[in-house]
């Protein structure tokens, strides 16, 4: 019997009708759905309610129902266990999602027949160090961003790669992105589009106050060090636009490729460049 986690975005599936239809399909195919305890209770499936850790660590795969934001959240939770994600789009853009809702059951049939591949996506790891002590760490599938607050002045951030000085960014912030994240915030800030399965790290300043500052692409083996080099800077570090931490003067942020990957289930032979044109045109 397969154990399948089902993670809905309840803001996009408000009445949980989509989730119920997926759970029904799983039960009809001799599978045990693993649901968040609150969601399970709302649906009348208390017996399938599980602790969050059990959902991500014990499921054979996860069905994520939502948009790219849902996938980014699920990806960070799945990564320590390597649990594959089948991403179903209930949003409007869906760069990361594999299928729309009208394709979900045909696609699940394919998965159960073994007609799928698993695509590995590189992730980033960030560690914030204060007074020589690690304070907090993050993982991200898309990007790690240092940005100024709503009313603060221009940020001043010293950047190094493998202890080699790169630049002092006078900007609204700096984006450190994966190839997956190259079509997200980094793209809006003028960064390059990178094929998603290539492994590189992209450094993109946000609105730099200079004539020459451009994105830099470095090796996945490189370690990026960012230093908050001036007092009275209202700066935040955020990961995938979902987790955040306030930074202080002299804080140091180390960013490198994570040892963990996001594993995305693929049932379609989608051409990345077709997807790129379609999704960016939709915007």
UniProtKB/Swiss-Prot annotation:
UniProt binding sites for NAD(+): 68-69, 142-143, 153, 172, 183-188, 242
Catalytic center residues: 68 (proton acceptor)
GO MF terms, alphabetically ordered: ATP binding; metal ion binding; NAD binding; NAD+ kinase activity
GO cellular component: cytoplasm
Swiss-Prot/TrEMBL cofactor(s): a divalent metal cation
InterPro entries registered for this protein in UniProt: ATP-NAD_kinase_N, ATP-NAD_kinase_PpnK-typ_C, NAD/diacylglycerol_kinase_sf, NADK
Gene Ontology biological process terms, A to Z: NAD metabolic process; NADP biosynthetic process
Domain of life: Bacteria
Cross-referenced Pfam families: NAD_kinase, NAD_kinase_C
Reactions catalysed, as given in the entry: NAD(+) + ATP = ADP + NADP(+) + H(+)
PANTHER family for the chain: NAD KINASE (PTHR20275:SF0)
Task of the protein: Involved in the regulation of the intracellular balance of NAD and NADP, and is a key enzyme in the biosynthesis of NADP. Catalyzes specifically the phosphorylation on 2'-hydroxyl of the adenosine moiety of NAD to yield NADP.
Official protein name in the record: NAD kinase
Species, as recorded: Thermoanaerobacter pseudethanolicus (strain ATCC 33223 / 39E)
């Amino acid at each position: 019997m397969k154990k399948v986690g089902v993670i809905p975005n309840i803001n996009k599936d408000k009445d949980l009708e989509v989730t119920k239809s997926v759970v029904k399909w799983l039960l009809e195919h001799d599978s045990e759905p693993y649901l968040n305890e609150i969601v399970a209770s709302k649906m009348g499936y208390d017996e399938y309610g599980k602790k969050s850790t059990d959902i991500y660590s014990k499921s054979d795969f996860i069905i994520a129902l939502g948009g790219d934001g849902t996938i980014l959240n699920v990806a960070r939770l799945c990564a320590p266990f390597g649990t594959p994600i089948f991403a179903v789009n209930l949003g409007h853009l869906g760069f990361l999602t594999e299928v729309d809702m009208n394709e979900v059951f045909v696609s699940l049939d394919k998965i159960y027949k073994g007609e799928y591949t698993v695509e590995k996506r590189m992730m980033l790891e960030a560690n914030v160090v204060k007074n020589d002590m690690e304070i907090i760490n993050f993982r991200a599938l898309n990007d790690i961003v240092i940005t100024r607050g709503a009313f603060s002045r221009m940020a001043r951030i010293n950047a190094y790669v493998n202890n080699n000085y790169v630049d002092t960014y006078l900007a609204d912030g700096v984006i450190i992105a994966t190839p997956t994240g190259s079509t997200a915030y980094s793209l809006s800030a003028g960064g390059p589009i990178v094929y998603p399965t290539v492994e590189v790290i992209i450094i993109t300043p946000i609105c730099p106050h200079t004539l020459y500052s451009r994105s830099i692409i470095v090796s996945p083996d490189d370690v990026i060090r960012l230093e908050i080099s001036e007092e009275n800077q209202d700066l935040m570090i955020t990961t995938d636009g979902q987790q955040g931490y306030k930074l202080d003067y002299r804080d140091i942020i180390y960013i490198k490729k994570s040892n963990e990957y996001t594993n995305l289930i693929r049932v379609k032979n989608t051409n990345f460049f077709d997807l790129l044109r379609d999704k960016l045109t939709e915007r």
